Amino acid sequence: MVQLKTAALALLFAGQALSGPVDSRQASVSIDAKFKAHGKKYLGTIGDQYTLTKNTKNPAIIKADFGQLTPENSMKWDATEPNRGQFTFSGSDYLVNFAQSNGKLIRGHTLVWHSQLPGWVSSITDKNTLISVLKNHITTVMTRYKGKIYAWDVLNEIFNEDGSLRNSVFYNVIGEDYVRIAFETARSVDPNAKLYINDYNLDSAGYSKVNGMVSHVKKWLAAGIPIDGIGSQTHLGAGAGSAVAGALNALASAGTKEIAITELDIAGASSTDYVNVVNACLNQAKCVGITVWGVADPDSWRSSSSPLLFDGNYNPKAAYNAIANAL
């Protein structure tokens, strides 16, 4: 088993200087490079045009420390196809161009989700119409970025907490077969992209949602549906990092080729929690990478809980230094 050197945690509280500018952060080698040295594919974060242009510190940190980018909002349905058949890609183009020009892998997020869905989609009641709309959306978005996206979150948050399938417009109108339709369409458009199913609250082995994900994915794989990976968002409360290892092992048992932590943030950003999560991925062979859901606390969707690796002044926090010192 690969283990972070937990003794390095002691260094965090013995005079760590966390108030220096970004260009004098402690890590002389990026945390992405350190993570890759353990055989993983990336340690990444998110971005979009607003956060990449609001100041110079945010993009500087991304360039220096992270190896992968996920668009926070610009590839979601409401951003890319607000009206039927009328696509707009200015925001997602900006993110993709930034990532490619700086040598970052890209995770496409997300093709099919019940939220941030335009009303014209959610109001469709005819099965054949919705299937046509679903296929066209996936095909158009993926075609634009074919060959540029490492992995796509094809389906996002389709499970209820009890492990059953959510009553979204896609499930209610098409039925469970929308899962097959979505993944087969995605595979036909870009055969080289990794295709993921992504969800939250997959953070504890034995939890009903984890069990539901595993059992459904096993069934879908047996039916030939081309699911390459399971994404665990991993939005954690304080102290929850220790359960992630067991959860990843459970998800890996579903039989996909890979799994990933896709939207990591942790209330309070304790060093112990972050190290536990990084260890969990290191110790699970199928876990290819971690995406932290934001660079600095002010831009976090849960900013009041200070869940990220950089503070309001874009200085590295103790959790960042825990990872940098221990990898």
From Swiss-Prot:
One annotated GO biological process: xylan catabolic process
Protein induction: Nucleotide sequences for binding catabolite repression protein CREA were detected in the promoter region.
Signal sequence interval, chain numbering: 1-19
Reactions accelerated catalytically: Endohydrolysis of (1->4)-beta-D-xylosidic linkages in xylans
Keywords: Carbohydrate metabolism, Disulfide bond, Glycosidase, Hydrolase, Polysaccharide degradation, Secreted, Signal, Xylan degradation
EC number: 3.2.1.8
Pathway note: Glycan degradation; xylan degradation
Disulfide pairings: 281-287
Main location: secreted
GO molecular function: endo-1,4-beta-xylanase activity
Subcellular location: Secreted
GO CC field: extracellular region
Residues the record marks as active site: 157, 263
Keyword Signal: yes
Top EC class of this enzyme: hydrolase
Domain GH10: start-end pairs: 46-326
Function: Endo-1,4-beta-xylanase involved in the hydrolysis of xylan, a major structural heterogeneous polysaccharide found in plant biomass representing the second most abundant polysaccharide in the biosphere, after cellulose.
Entry similarity comment: Belongs to the glycosyl hydrolase 10 (cellulase F) family.
Protein name in the entry: Endo-1,4-beta-xylanase A
Organism encoding this protein: Penicillium canescens
